[in-house]
């Protein structure tokens, strides 16, 4: 049974003193041995973390006791291994970056649609279905007949709307994303632009996969996630994709057989895009990763003090073994 609980959470809420939450939240996560990243901003909280069930329960209880963070939206999935290396709490201008001033999901937002009602909505021929995620996410899975805006970042989404959608022509627009947070902003943006009937999938793709049976599902492929699992299947288990550590693109086993694929250095997606300087840096990073593995240490995101302590204990154990051997010879 998978013993690592992965928790994706967010909440749009006014947090005028969000900076003061960072240290106590980080301390709580470190004490509970929770890894992952949470973002704090004046507009709320967002992120994905992982730990034991008890640790995640403790985190959710802690957040529920903070003014404004009660009843936070979260989705759980499971993994056999810890999908994160670090524990981080970052202070940001936005908890999901669209880059458009004045968009506030607390004031105006699209109509939430439950996973159980989603199929009926997107099967309506009058509904335009738009995937708000980035192109590399869409490539490995999306809903049947969904439009791919082919964006590299969420900042590009407003330009896509301006160039391709018209409130006079597109009367009904439905949108979706991984966990729901990008749709909060995208639907708020469309409402501000004059679109009247705007819908979004409540809880995002992850909630849909959790609640809708696979035989009834209109989801095709796997769902990209922002952790070391890379993607999850319809059962929310780790999927078939790996990830290029150079460009972060999801890659298949077939792509890993390509001459362009060098572990940690390049893949077919980025071989022609990285500079010689980047390549040298990636080669050195991979060397450090392999060196850390040979010492049975985690490289990326390891707590330096933990690594030093592990080395000290190893040396001390070797010293004691040597002393015992010398004593036996006497």
Swiss-Prot record:
Keyword tRNA processing attached: yes
Coiled-coil stretches noted in the UniProt entry, renumbered to this chain: none
Catalytic site: 177 (cysteine persulfide intermediate)
GO biological process, one term: tRNA modification
Record keywords: Oxidoreductase, tRNA processing
InterPro entries in the record: Rhodanese-like_dom (IPR001763), Rhodanese-like_dom_sf (IPR036873), TrhO (IPR020936), TRHO_N (IPR040503)
Reactions listed under catalytic activity: uridine(34) in tRNA + AH2 + O2 = 5-hydroxyuridine(34) in tRNA + A + H2O
Rhodanese domain span: 123-217
EC annotation from Swiss-Prot or TrEMBL: 1.14.-.-
One Gene Ontology molecular-function label: oxidoreductase activity, acting on paired donors, with incorporation or reduction of molecular oxygen
Function: Catalyzes oxygen-dependent 5-hydroxyuridine (ho5U) modification at position 34 in tRNAs.
HAMAP family hit by this protein: TrhO
Similarity-based family: Belongs to the TrhO family.
Record PANTHER family: RHODANESE-LIKE DOMAIN-CONTAINING PROTEIN 7-RELATED, THIOSULFATE SULFURTRANSFERASE/RHODANESE-LIKE DOMAIN-CONTAINING PROTEIN 2
Record protein name field: tRNA uridine(34) hydroxylase
């Amino acid at each position: 049974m998978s013993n690592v609980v992965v928790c994706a959470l967010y909440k749009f809420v006014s947090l005028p003193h969000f900076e003061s939450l960072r240290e106590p939240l980080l301390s709580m996560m470190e004490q509970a041995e929770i890894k992952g990243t949470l973002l704090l901003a004046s507009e709320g909280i967002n992120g994905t973390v992982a730990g034991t069930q008890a640790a995640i329960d403790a985190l959710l209880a802690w957040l529920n006791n903070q003014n404004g963070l009660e009843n936070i939206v979260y989705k759980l999935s499971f993994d056999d291994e810890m999908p994160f290396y670090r524990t981080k709490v970052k202070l940001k201008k936005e908890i999901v970056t669209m880059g458009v001033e004045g968009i506030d999901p607390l004031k105006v937002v699209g109509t939430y649609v439950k996973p159980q009602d989603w199929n009926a909505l997107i099967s309506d021929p009058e509904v335009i279905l738009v995937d708000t995620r980035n192109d590399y996410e869409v490539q490995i899975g999306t809903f049947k007949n969904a439009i791919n805006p082919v964006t590299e970042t969420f900042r590009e989404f407003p330009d896509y709307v301006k160039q391709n959608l018209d409130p006079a022509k597109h009367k009904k627009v439905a949108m979706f994303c991984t966990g729901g947070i990008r749709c909060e902003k995208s639907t708020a943006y469309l409402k501000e632009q004059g679109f009247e009937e705007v819908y979004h999938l409540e809880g995002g793709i992850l909630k849909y996969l959790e609640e809708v049976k696979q035989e009834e599902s209109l989801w095709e492929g796997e769902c990209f996630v922002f952790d070391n699992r890379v993607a999850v299947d319809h059962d929310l288990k780790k999927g078939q994709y790996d990830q290029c550590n150079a460009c972060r693109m999801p890659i298949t086993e077939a792509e890993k057989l390509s001459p362009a694929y060098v572990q940690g250095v390049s893949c077919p997606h980025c071989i022609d895009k990285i500079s010689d300087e980047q390549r040298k840096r990636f080669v050195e990073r991979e060397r450090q990763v392999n060196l850390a593995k040979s010492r049975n240490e985690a490289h990326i995101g390891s707590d330096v003090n933990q690594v030093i302590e592990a080395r000290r204990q190893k040396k001390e154990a070797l010293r004691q073994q040597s002393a015992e051997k010398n004593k036996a010879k006497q």
